[in-house]
Amino acid sequence: AAITVKEAAVREEQLATIQDELGSFSTDFSSSGDSRSGNLQNGAAKINGHVLMPGETLSGYECMHPFTKENGYFSAAAYENGRVVDSIGGGVCQISTTLYQAALRAELEIVQRQNHSMIVGYVKPSMDAATAGTVKDLKVTNNYSTPIYVEGYTKGRTLTFTIYGKETRPANRTVEFVSETVSYTHLR
């Protein structure tokens, strides 16, 4: 029988450039019950370890779905049409949000991101990223000229995402993210 040798998609010398922390962010879920906490641990593990080559895009939804019990998810609170409902995979938006904040700090290209229909408690207003099928999905693209590595995990009641790669940005740069409330809408 003939043996076919296939070239590796990622070469060792490319991976050797992944040596610097480009951006990191953590959120707290100490008020979450066991089911929601389990969803955060499961979803973070599904994103953890992704390597993105230059120009490649990561979809939070594609990494984490399907949101089923068979895929390790539990029923927990989620937002749906302006209400709080129980849903399999409830809480995974905190994963998207934490990854979004790490991606902003790494200055990755944000291809797709939508906010929630209501305020969330784990980040300031406008700093969130919702997940609802492919309609509300976080997609980030590696706009660096070298590969990046995405690390995601929970420890205790903290969820963390860190993006690693080759740092090329000036060391003395300053990047600031501001959440400012410009008006309130009172619902009746």
Model-derived segments and their meaning:
Residues 1-188:
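Well-ordered beta-sheet/strand-loop patches within structured domains
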